[in-house]
Amino acid sequence: MTASAPRRPAAFLDRDGVINYNDHYVGTRERLRWMPGIAAAIRQLNAAGYYVFIITNQSGVARGMFSEDDVRALHRWMLDELNTQGARIDDVRFCPHHVEGTLDAYRVACEHRKPGPGMILDLAKTWPVDMTRSFVIGDSASDVEAAKAAGIPGFRFEGEDIDVFVKQVLIEMQRAAVSN
């Protein structure tokens, strides 16, 4: 991304519990079950002019369940699958660390691990993001806390229809923009 590109808002989406079901330690496509309506939700964000990013804690790496390469391969496949449905993900960040990991190299506290804002802030530095109009959607308190730590709103998705949920978030963000 070039620094001269116009700033756009971003939707930072948690992976497990928003993009796909949270089936714990999903490291391969064989274990991934898409959240119904996710492609439509992402297309909605694309049409509204948002960058769409995935931010995800992947402690399965720290626990030796799968490798960083496995996670990257899964993410490439996910982005390709979504793209065939006209749903574009612009970038992905994941944190493989966990203080209780079984692999020494990954047993560390890391600002990128949610609730830390590291993944959000890294993407905002890499892409021309308008943080004043950006938000996070996640399924846990740590996702909302990461949003707050990054200075943006966080919305907690609890398994309803993700397409309808995204529509409601976009309406709320538009209302907030008008009232400011």
UniProtKB/Swiss-Prot annotation:
The record marks 113 as: Contributes to substrate recognition. The active site is at residues 14, 16. Keywords: Carbohydrate metabolism, Cytoplasm, Hydrolase, Lipopolysaccharide biosynthesis, Magnesium, Metal-binding. Its EC number is 3.1.3.82. Its cofactor is Mg(2+). It is found in: Cytoplasm. It is an enzyme of class 3 (hydrolase). Mg(2+) binds at residues 14, 16, 139. Substrate binds at residues 14-16, 22-25, 56-59, 113-114. Belongs to the gmhB family. Monomer. This is D-glycero-beta-D-manno-heptose-1,7-bisphosphate 7-phosphatase. It comes from Rhodopseudomonas palustris (strain ATCC BAA-98 / CGA009). The lineage of its organism: Bacteria, Pseudomonadati, Pseudomonadota, Alphaproteobacteria, Hyphomicrobiales.
